């Protein structure tokens, strides 16, 4: 998901997607600890996605 797509989402929908991404990231970390992932770069991508979502939410909060 690109930053432009993230900005188009409604705040409530963005928060729901963020919660889902955080849960998926936690699950990926657990799975990676047990047996290595095919591509550890997926963890980096997931962290970046979460950071972008949090950034957009914070920008909206400050602009109110």
From Swiss-Prot:
Keywords: Ribonucleoprotein, Ribosomal protein. GO terms for molecular function: structural constituent of ribosome. This is Large ribosomal subunit protein uL29. Coiled coil: none annotated. Belongs to the universal ribosomal protein uL29 family. NCBIfam families: L29. InterPro entries: Ribosomal_uL29, Ribosomal_uL29_sf. It comes from Porphyromonas gingivalis (strain ATCC BAA-308 / W83). GO terms for cellular component: ribonucleoprotein complex; ribosome.
């Amino acid at each position: 998901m690109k930053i432009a797509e993230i900005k188009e989402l409604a705040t409530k929908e963005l928060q729901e997607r963020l919660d889902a991404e955080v849960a998926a990231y936690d699950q990926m970390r657990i799975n990676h600890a047990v047996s290595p992932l095919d591509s550890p770069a997926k963890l980096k991508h997931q962290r970046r996605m979460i950071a972008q979502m949090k950034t957009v939410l914070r920008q909206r909060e400050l602009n109110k």
